[in-house]
């Protein structure tokens, strides 16, 4: 993969002015309003789930560029403040826009995956990420394939890191997931398969065995 394609950050869906703003933030962060940049990235992440999967990488790059250029963290502070605001309003978001809710969970997990303090995940994000995943593991969420898919994808991405930060909450989360799998609910056959795969994935030390991969992914393709 070329350097250009690796660093495009999926910003083609922005208008030309915003693309230029983001490119400048990446190269010369002191030349732009970084709080505005943080809001632009969060706003777009709530609308575009493809971008929300890439946004953490872009945010990390801007944070690194700002730190190197000025030794400051204006962008990170603005980003975390906005994440907190959306976290506080997460129930309203889920009620009015399922897509927006799934994009938000994808985004906050992506940020948790990329942002580091002293080479460790940010403690401030651990409980908010867990709270979002707990909501996805509630019975009414498990009846929606979009939310089950999001739960499983995010646990694949950050589950192992989260467990290292707070193993007790991961145990509690998997009690909910097992109950959802075992108790009579409105689970689709695909959702049931995804939950079983996730239960076995964690039991295997957050790894998919070759046999499990062959079984589950042949089932999904069928």
From Swiss-Prot:
Annotated ranges, domain MIF4G: 3-205
Residue spans crossing the bilayer: none
Alphabetized Pfam families for the sequence: MIF4G
Molecular-function GO terms, alphabetical: identical protein binding; RNA binding
This protein's GO CC annotations: cytoplasm; cytosol; Golgi apparatus; histone mRNA stem-loop binding complex; nucleolus
Subunit structure: Interacts with EIF4G1, EIF4G2 and SLBP; probably tethered by SLBP to the 3'-end of mRNAs ending with the histone stem-loop, it also interacts with EIF4G1 which is bound to their 5'-end.
Name of the molecule in the record: MIF4G domain-containing protein
Biological source species: Mus musculus
